[in-house]
Amino acid sequence: MPKKKLIGEVVSDKMDKTVVVAVSTLVKHPRVGKYIKRTKKYYAHDENNECRDGDIVEIIESRPLSKLKRWRVLRIVERSVFADETLDEELEGGSSDDN
């Protein structure tokens, strides 16, 4: 049986080798018939700490890696603009607003 794959947005990268990915889906309300947006969070393993907040990533099902982690980051689909700016600041050695 093939492993499940999901695409979502990284909402937290504060942990070592772990990211929290929010995956949104549309679910039809049984009585009203209106589509409702549902969001679920998944803890995913990020081996090289490459993911940053706001990145769009693809995750794949895996064996249990810890109490909460059952997913691995397969690839980064799209980098966030915010993540690129903070990475540039870190490389420069701080904020450029210092007077």
UniProtKB/Swiss-Prot annotation:
Leader peptide range in chain numbering: none
Record Gene3D superfamilies: Nucleic acid-binding proteins (2.40.50.140)
Descriptive protein name: Small ribosomal subunit protein uS17
NCBIfam families according to UniProt: PRK05610.1, uS17_bact
Family stated for the protein in its record: Belongs to the universal ribosomal protein uS17 family.
Pfam families, per database record: Ribosomal_S17
One example GO MF annotation: rRNA binding
The keyword Amino-acid biosynthesis is assigned to this record: no
Keyword set, alphabetical order: Ribonucleoprotein, Ribosomal protein, RNA-binding, rRNA-binding
Cellular component GO terms, alphabetical: cytosolic small ribosomal subunit
Biological process annotations from GO: translation
